[in-house]
Amino acid sequence: MFMSSFIMAIDQGTTSSRTCIINQAGGLVAEAREAFKQIFPKPGWVEHDPEDIWYSTQRSMRLALEKAKIKGSQIRTIGITNQRETVMLWDAKSGKALHNAIVWQCRRTQDLCEKLKKNKKEKIITAKTGLVLDPYFSATKIQWLLKNVPNAAKKAKDGQALAGTVDSFLLWKLTAGHSHKTDVSNASRTMLMNIHTGWWDEDLLKIFGVPEAILPEICPSNSDFGVTQGLGFMPDGIPITGIVGDQQAALFGQTCFETGDSKCTFGTGSFLLLNTGKKAVKSKNKLLTTIAWKLKNQEMTYALEGGAFVCGAAVQWLRDGLGLIQQSSDVEALAKTVDGTDGVEFVPALTGLGAPHWQPEARGLICGLTRGSTKAHIARATLEAMALQNVDILNTMQRDLGKKLRGVRVDGGAAANDLLMQMQADYCGANVVRPQNLETTALGAAFMAGLGAGVWKDLKEIKRVWKVNKEFKVKMTPKARKERLQRWAQALERV
């Protein structure tokens, strides 16, 4: 075993870049975060400056090393996880961005998607990618950049421009332009990769008008992606051996390695992924079929993905919009002052309904109010709604997979809320497991890189490193669960 078994996990997110130093025991040694600017040029448009992404990433790397009180030479390997779908175009020689990055939230390509739907392209796109035709994914974003950025199409044609998701841009920068690669999980979100072959698809490239030459090489998630060069604060030659998209990284960080394992990340929204093993399960309910990861010399591992638009954001709204609580963490104590909601239901469709309903025009609803209703009832109804909308997604996943869940592993900020976690277990009828380390996205990148570099020799060794904080066992009877889910379904019908 190497003396220096520290792993650096870069977690490049939507609002900040973060670096975690993880030790061989899977423990968090140090963490540093650097926020960066959000750019909104027009309503519905969201951009990031690629130089901000790169600067904030470097700064978080330096700060994490300082906090850990270690030198860059003590890093055994680097793993990268990142906001998915966000895409950029840069000069192949200088590395200078040709335009701001177009962020996953950006809706500017809605018209391009509608045009493709009218031209009957949706069926072939979904069959090859497992995705729904939507501006969320990278393909129409790259198409927009090539059409609208001066000289971009010519530079692309002449081999003078490169395109990629955030992971491939960071890799290119970390290796001083020597490596233009991505992993299967990130590539599966571009809408340009065939998830059944694991490579860029000729038909899709033609549909979106993207030349293959500008795209990175697709690799297994624990590949030898390249080595550091020219960073200054770290020596040259440190290997980068893990890349995985953020939600897939959380699935891996939760050691959801078996078919039927699932994780739920409680963030602004909630993200649920279910490991479907070697089979790309086609959803009958508009869930996304995606690649979880591919390990070297192994078959692809697939997943089903669904998300609710509003999760923690509902609690923020109670705080900022209604003024019911002073800080988000107060919601649990307030909700505990009552035994139930006393008939109050809250459907938090504040920005529409996500999976499995897909009603972007839907708006939020609080119903069942009486003179006896208090802010505590509304607080409790909010927590119940957060759990119930996840149940809708989990039940849909079970139907698509054709087998019962093996339990749910949870992470993200709201996973620290014991009352919410017990509700989640009761309403989905499966035990909920919370790990000691809730930063599972960074941990997933560290596990992947460690696997690639030989810090851990296999998935069994990684499983031994993963530690449980608490398991929430089902307490609710099947009859009570059925009645509660019926009341929720009735509230949804009123939205």
Curated annotation (Swiss-Prot):
SUPFAM superfamilies xref list: Actin-like ATPase domain
Keyword Transmembrane in annotation: no
Positions that bind glycerol: 84-85, 136, 246-247
Pathway entry: Polyol metabolism; glycerol degradation via glycerol kinase pathway; sn-glycerol 3-phosphate from glycerol: step 1/1
Keywords: ATP-binding, Glycerol metabolism, Kinase, Nucleotide-binding, Transferase
UniProt GO cellular component terms: cytosol
Enzyme class: transferase
GO molecular function: ATP binding; glycerol kinase activity
Sequence positions that bind ATP: 14-16, 268, 312, 316, 413
UniProt: ADP binding residues: 14, 18, 268, 312, 413, 417
EC number: 2.7.1.30
PROSITE patterns named among the record's database cross-references: FGGY_KINASES_1, FGGY_KINASES_2
Biological processes per GO annotation: glycerol catabolic process; glycerol metabolic process; glycerol-3-phosphate metabolic process
CDD domains: FGGY_EcGK_like (cd07786)
Reactions it catalyzes: glycerol + ATP = sn-glycerol 3-phosphate + ADP + H(+)
Residues at which sn-glycerol 3-phosphate binds: 14, 84-85, 136, 246
HAMAP family: Glycerol_kin (MF_00186)
Family to which this protein belongs: Belongs to the FGGY kinase family.
Function: Key enzyme in the regulation of glycerol uptake and metabolism. Catalyzes the phosphorylation of glycerol to yield sn-glycerol 3-phosphate.
Protein name, UniProt field: Glycerol kinase
